[in-house]
């Protein structure tokens, strides 16, 4: 059985790590490299960095901090933010990132996924999906440019349809960001994640809602995701990564200790 992964998420804005609630009201948490080092030392399996305003502001991730992170940590990390071309992706990988993630640019041009996969291989192409539950229509919809609330917009995609499309285009992994749950620490959206799991043939990472160790156990046991991403519980010291892994191991969930 493949080990389940614990993945701290670092949202980056103007060179600092920030965290919001439901993608709004972001506050500064700390500096990029020290936080990355801390999580690597604490036993994280992987890190994800999102430059949250890059796509909305029509720019790309600052490569300088990508290279600094690569010099200081020895676990895989993924970067996202404004990557629209093969050349931009190549640069980030050359500076030390193990994977690149694409979200809003893929919604604008879905064929970008196929071009990236052809160039670099599916194993390092991650698609981030910002999914919002619309109670009025009882449906999950994909939103775009969510890093800047003034730029956020609806798309025509139902989440499940977009999950199917990005797999057809050749993505290697999907991060499902459940916007309604983000930062509120009330648990992952097991219903939505289970639905997506049933149509997702690539590794699926749950994002949004972690508040307790039990929430991690639930998302692995009930939704059968491959990895669980979280931010505020790690940034605020609510959950220690090694303690979390010991807890999960005691619950018979395969993790790397």
From Swiss-Prot:
InterPro entries attached to this UniProt entry = Aldolase_TIM (IPR013785), His_biosynth (IPR006062), HisF (IPR004651), IGPS_HisA/HisF (IPR050064), RibuloseP-bd_barrel (IPR011060)
> Which GO terms of the molecular function aspect are on file?
imidazoleglycerol-phosphate synthase activity; lyase activity
What general EC class does the enzyme of this chain belong to?
A: lyase
Q: Which UniProt keywords apply?
A: Amino-acid biosynthesis, Cytoplasm, Histidine biosynthesis, Lyase
The metabolic or biological pathway listed in the UniProt record of this protein is: Amino-acid biosynthesis; L-histidine biosynthesis; L-histidine from 5-phospho-alpha-D-ribose 1-diphosphate: step 5/9
Active-site residues, Swiss-Prot/TrEMBL = 11, 130
From the UniProt record, list the reaction(s) this protein catalyses: 5-[(5-phospho-1-deoxy-D-ribulos-1-ylimino)methylamino]-1-(5-phospho-beta-D-ribosyl)imidazole-4-carboxamide + L-glutamine = D-erythro-1-(imidazol-4-yl)glycerol 3-phosphate + 5-amino-1-(5-phospho-beta-D-ribosyl)imidazole-4-carboxamide + L-glutamate + H(+)
Q: What is its main location?
A: cytoplasm
Q: Which GO terms describe its cellular component?
A: cytoplasm
One Pfam family assigned to this protein is: His_biosynth
Q: What is its EC number?
A: 4.3.2.10
Localization annotation: Cytoplasm
Top-level taxonomic group: Bacteria
Which family is this sequence assigned to? Answer: Belongs to the HisA/HisF family.
**Record HAMAP family:** HisF
Q: Subunit composition?
A: Heterodimer of HisH and HisF.
This one is known as Imidazole glycerol phosphate synthase subunit HisF
Provide the species name.
Answer: Shewanella pealeana (strain ATCC 700345 / ANG-SQ1)
Upper classification of the source organism reads: Bacteria, Pseudomonadati, Pseudomonadota, Gammaproteobacteria, Alteromonadales
């Amino acid at each position: 059985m493949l080990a389940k992964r614990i993945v701290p998420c670092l949202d980056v804005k103007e060179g600092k790590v920030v965290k919001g609630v439901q993608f709004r009201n972001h506050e500064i948490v700390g500096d990029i490299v020290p936080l990355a080092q801390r999580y690597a030392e604490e036993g994280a399996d992987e890190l994800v960095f999102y430059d949250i305003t890059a796509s909305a502001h029509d720019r790309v991730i600052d490569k300088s901090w990508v290279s600094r992170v690569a010099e200081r940590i020895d676990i895989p990390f993924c970067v996202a933010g404004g990557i629209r071309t093969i050349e931009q992706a190549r640069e980030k990988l050359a500076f030390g990132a193990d994977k690149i993630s694409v979200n809003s640019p893929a919604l604008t041009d879905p064929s970008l996924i196929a071009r990236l996969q052809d160039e670099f291989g599916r194993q390092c192409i991650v698609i981030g999906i910002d999914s919002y539950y619309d109670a009025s229509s009882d449906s999950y919809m994909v939103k775009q440019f969510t890093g800047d609330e003034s730029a956020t917009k609806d798309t025509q995609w139902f989440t499940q349809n977009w999950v199917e499309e990005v797999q057809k285009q050749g993505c290697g992994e999907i991060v499902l960001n459940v916007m309604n749950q983000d930062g509120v620490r009330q648990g992952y959206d097991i219903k939505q994640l289970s639905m997506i799991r049933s149509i997702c043939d690539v590794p699926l990472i749950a994002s949004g809602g972690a508040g307790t160790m039990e929430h991690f156990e639930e998302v692995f046991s009930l939704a059968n995701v491959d990895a669980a991403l979280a931010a505020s519980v790690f940034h605020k010291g609510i959950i220690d990564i090694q303690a979390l892994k010991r807890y999960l191991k005691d619950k018979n969930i395969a993790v790397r200790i």
